[in-house]
Amino acid sequence: MSVFKNLFILWSLFLFMSSCNNNTNDFIEISREKYSNQLYGFWLGQSIANWTGLITEMDKIGNIGDIKTGSFYTREDWGGIDLRSIWEDQSIDKSNIRIDYSLRSEEEVWGSDDDTDIEYMYQFLLNYFDTSILSPSQIREGWIKHIKAEEENYLWVSNQRAFDLMNQGILPPETGEPSNNEFYNMIDAQLTTEIFGLFSPTRPEFAIRMAELPIKTTARGEAQEIAEFYVRMHSLASNPKEFNSTKENIFWIANESRKYLSDNNYPAKMYDFTEGLYNSGIKWEQARDSIYSRYQVEQKDGYDITSKNLYCNGCFAAGINFASSLVSLFYGEGDIKKTIKIGTLSGWDSDNPTSTWGGLIGFLIGKEMIEREFNTNFSSKFNIHRTRQNFPNKGIDSFIHMAAEGIKVVDRVVEEELKGEINLIKNTWLIPVK
């Protein structure tokens, strides 16, 4: 009997150990310290890319309609004189403005812009209201308090329309409903919500839940789908897979996110078309010219913005700027400097794709690697009051503090929403795989 008893004990111990191993494999462990550095990299990379892309914003939109801007920029224009945008008249002297990286030294301060300030506001609101999912009234309260009522308030198209509706007492998601907001298919949601992906590491399905109402505040249809694509990419940036390069990593993230685009809609077709151009070996300028011809001249794949005769031929539209962003995504190959350069020269709302990829790549490689790539030490100070209002400390913040605030959001999401754990001894998160 003792032999059988010992065998039973050994078998039970084996089953217990197997169960422990399985439970360990059911969790993904992420360093909170490393993640904080990555969030710093997100804000720094996004700021560099945003301010660089702003130099050429709306300089080049094509030659359809009343506004014609001539040939698009090419790599030969990098370092050259910045041409006038569609808003600038002949009285503006731009002879001393060059198309080059826009950087801030340690003594300077990064200013906010519409590609960073709404994300900053949403992070602030999540902690202010101690929640993981903002309610319609919380979003409206935040917009009314932190966005200036009078121009210049750095809102455009759908964001401005949603803000006007909020001031009339209308709550999200009705502010993005096509019957209320004729700009629902513009770019706005895809440049204001990417950060929600970083609040739900490795779990894009919950990131989409967090971002759903902020996205629907200004977008529907394909514009909503594009915004969700970016959110998904940012969530998958925390995946535990091992890659040989940032290029391999970001291409995997992109292809995984592509699986959730509807094959019947133009975002998926734009993705597949642009990826095919990249794989064909043609230069990025040829790829950019091809998407211009296909989507704005020929109106293929159901993208018919040109037929609507909009101002600047819909240069603010979600679709053409998404296609443009894919050019810098693929051809940038995960190199932050190369990606920002291509995005800046690609045309249309050039600060939008650059900001998105600058932030994502900045997150992937972190603060130190960004500074190594640019061979400089950057400012960590950030002035949210350049474009928004009513934040603490007269709007002066730092990337260190902004990263710490992001960690607070993730802590709450991991424990309360993902049913994971915070290991304060190891300073890690244990996040269930599902």
PLM features: residue spans?
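Accessory "access/gating" subregions that flank catalytic or transport cores
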Residues: 163-184, 193-203, 212-217, 231-347
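Catalytic phosphate/nucleotide-handling subdomain of diverse soluble enzymes
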Residues: 48, 52, 59-83, 219-222, ...
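Active-site-surrounding "flap" and adjacent substrate/cofactor-binding loops of secreted or lumenal enzymes
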Residues: 55-101, 116-118, 140, 150-153
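Mature, well-folded catalytic/scaffold domains that follow N-terminal targeting or propeptide regions
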Residues: 35, 39-40, 166-177, 182-190, ...
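Sec-dependent signal peptide recognition
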Residues: 2-11
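Acidic, carboxylate-rich catalytic segments that either coordinate divalent cations
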Residues: 268-311, 364-434
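C-terminal motif of bacterial Sec signal peptides marking the signal peptidase cleavage site
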Residues: 17-19
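Extracytoplasmic mature domains of secreted/periplasmic and thylakoid-lumen proteins
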Residues: 110-112, 116, 126-187, 198
